[in-house]
Amino acid sequence: MRQNKLIEKITASQLRDDIPEFRAGDTVRVHARIVEGSRERIQMFEGVVIKRHGAGISATYTVRKISNGVGVERTFPVHSPRVDKIDVLRYGRVRRAKLYYLRERTGKATRIAERRRDN
């Protein structure tokens, strides 16, 4: 058995199937499990997905929000057990895969048009 096939078999059991479809430009709310000492709580992080990267078990996405006038970005693994759930709030219409240009924009310049979705 080739090494790639072995890795695929091992990681296939760890892939999550409850992840909704989302891409760059979409507004999401990520429910992340945070461990503080012996306590565990769920922290919500809501913002715009500025990029998705990779495939399979190593796939990640970065969410950006503005908190108290400061831009905050967090990168989450797509298939992480630390992410409780992902809610897609808005589907954005963008023409780029990576929205790094949002880092230089503030206020109304960061708005993204909504994408039509056929059910």
Curated annotation (Swiss-Prot):
Listed Gene3D superfamilies: 2.30.30.790
PROSITE patterns in the cross-refs: RIBOSOMAL_L19 (PS01015)
One Gene Ontology term from the biological process aspect of the record: translation
Keyword Acyltransferase (UniProt): no
GO MF terms held by the record: structural constituent of ribosome
Xref: Pfam families: Ribosomal_L19
Gene Ontology CC: one annotated term: cytosolic large ribosomal subunit
Alphabetical keyword list: Ribonucleoprotein, Ribosomal protein
PANTHER family: LARGE RIBOSOMAL SUBUNIT PROTEIN BL19M, RIBOSOMAL PROTEIN L19
Stated role: This protein is located at the 30S-50S ribosomal subunit interface and may play a role in the structure and function of the aminoacyl-tRNA binding site.
Family to which this protein belongs: Belongs to the bacterial ribosomal protein bL19 family.
NCBIfam families the UniProt entry points to: rplS_bact
Protein name: Large ribosomal subunit protein bL19
Species of the source: Limosilactobacillus reuteri (strain DSM 20016)
Gene name, Swiss-Prot/TrEMBL: rplS
